[in-house]
Amino acid sequence: EIVDKYSESITSMIGGDHSVTACAVRGVKKAYPSERIGILQLDTHLDVRDPAELGPANGTPIRQLIDGGFVRGEDIVNIGLHGYFNAKPLIDYAKQHSIQMVTLKNARKAGVVESVKAALSQLSEKVDRIYVTVDMDVLDISVAPGVPASTPGGLSASELFDSLLEIGKHPSVRHIDFVCLDPSKDSQVAETTKTGVYAWLQFITGLRLR
């Protein structure tokens, strides 16, 4: 009934750790069982760890969705990979399931916003709706210390803001989440929290420009 009443609505979730994404996408699939879902993931990590090891957790949602048959690996684009956190077995799994991996280095060569626009265009050609998941650890530690896995060398705030404006403008984007923002680890000036709020507002601004 809710789906029928709000069929044109955009769902937005501000979550805890990244495990919530698996639950959210399963819910989308339940609501739209005949539709093909694509995922644009802005993240430092692949999040394809095996849940059989320690159970469903922060690093397992993408694998849960692929192994559960909710999303095809070929319908997932990850932009923002950097650092030394994606071990070979995880990369091998991603390659085996045809996940498109765009490192932050390569995204910057092409232009981060252009890389995001290309991913949205590519996904929209083959899926019915796009789910965007924004892991705040994709940001550089200097602007986002309040995340579980803060790292140097990540996205700048302006790169994320500009990307989210384009994401909000794209008609195939129907769902978005912002995850891994931990205020208890934030700085005294709450820069991660403020950056997260501005990121969400940029997405909303993009929606208004559709």
Q: Residue locations for each model-derived region?
A:
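Conserved alpha-helical scaffold segments that buttress catalytic/binding sites
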Residues: 1-210
